[in-house]
Amino acid sequence: VARKNDHPNVTVIGAGLAGVEATFQLIRRGVRVKLLEMRPKVPTGAHGTDLFAELVCSNSVGSNLPDRASGLLKEELRALSSYILDVAYKYRVPAGNALAVDREAFAREITRYMTGHSHVEFVNDEATEFPEEGIVILATGPLTSPRMLAWLSKTFGADKLAFFDAIAPVLTAESVDMTQAFVANRYGDAEEKGDYINCPMNKAEYEEFVTQLLAAERIHLPEFEKDARKQLFSGCQPVEEIASSGKDALRFGPMKPVGFTDPRTGRRPWAVVQLRQDNLLGSLYNIVGFQTNLKHGEQERVFRLIPALKNAVFTRLGQMHRNSYLFSPAFLTPTLQVKDRPDWFVAGQICGVEGYTESTGMGLLAGLNAARICLKKPPVVPPPQSMLGALVKYVTFEGHKVKEFSPMNANFGLLTGTTAPAKGESAESRRAAAIVEARRAFKAFIAEL
């Protein structure tokens, strides 16, 4: 256990997913933490509460299936006692094979625990630079304040990179016309009770929807340069941007109908809009994949063209915001320490990962290694064959070029250590082999901790 005193051993800047996870990994090992969070004193433009670990973009934490990259990463993080994932499972809402949470209950539980812990000194203030002494974990996230970004850019001598992100609307369940919708999971059994509300559309309805979507007025963003499409992270592309790439783009994206049969017709719909439960009560649903930057009045007008949503009551409308991150390969080691300042760590989305689970993983590793330094132990690096190790390798790989580096989700393309596929070998068998190797390597890693 770390030496106990009245002063924090580590300063964590930011109480998002990464900052909270880092803090937990420290305090569970007896290390005292000063946790700084600027909200609500300094708003971000995207967050709506003063709660820690607020989920802004979506309430889905990704796939829960063990043969999916996100599922494998969750398995690894739970083996390392991830606090964020423990709370996520506690406040889980039905979402098929995905892990989705009641975001308010989730954030309230985390805020209560962190602010009430004897080893956490919480400070509600903006950090504009690192403290002069002590170990620091930067976990300010993609909505880092301009003043902190300016200090980071000056300190690290590397320009920040940026991309734009978008948020999907949320509506009340009772306002959905269930005579025009059905409950089911994609490829679900007819006897199975589904988790998603599915809003089918025929060809004429879909084409009119796309026409109106493309014609709708968008919110003007002065920062949205002419080549900004390159800066849009693919996992959170605004629905209007997807539609602009082709008339059927939405049917092969968030509105794909495969795996569904409309019970009214007995046939597959032309397109389907999915609604996912957003809270434990089941009174709120979000529109899956419908991140948007349309003007608010236009969102209501266009989205009500979906037959089941003709009377939709929206509790939150979509918006776009700028997400910033650092070119971490220039200055981060695989332990998430700054190369010439081993007492500084960078974690979460600001270091170049994308996704809730991925951010949590970076926070976990930073917190674990900061704790090990406090305990006079060497920092560790997860094996590159594992999903966590593969993400770490991505954000610290020195071969990256600045303009080619962009936020990365967990995916099997990142994994190393598998043998070359034999002729005729399927993608499924290669993935299965990669999972076996990832589990073997990660088990050995944990055994050495």
Question: Could you describe each region identified by the protein language model?
Answer:
Residues 358-373:
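An active-site-proximal "capping" alpha-helix that borders the catalytic cofactor pocket
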Residues 116-276, 281, 285-296, 300-301:
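Predominantly flavin-linked oxidoreductase catalytic cores and closely associated redox partners
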Residues 54-65, 89-105:
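Dinucleotide-binding Rossmann-like beta1-alpha1 core, especially the glycine-rich loop
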Residues 24-85, 384-395:
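N-terminal FAD cofactor-binding segment of flavoenzymes
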Residues 40, 350, 369-449:
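Glycine- and aromatic-enriched mobile tails/lids
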Residues 4-18:
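Beta1/beta-strand and adjacent pyrophosphate-binding region of the FAD-binding site
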Residues 103-122:
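Helical element adjacent to the flavin cofactor pocket in flavoenzyme catalytic cores
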Residues 287-353, 360-362, 378-397, 402-409, ...:
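A glycine-rich dinucleotide-binding beta-alpha-beta segment and adjacent secondary-structure elements
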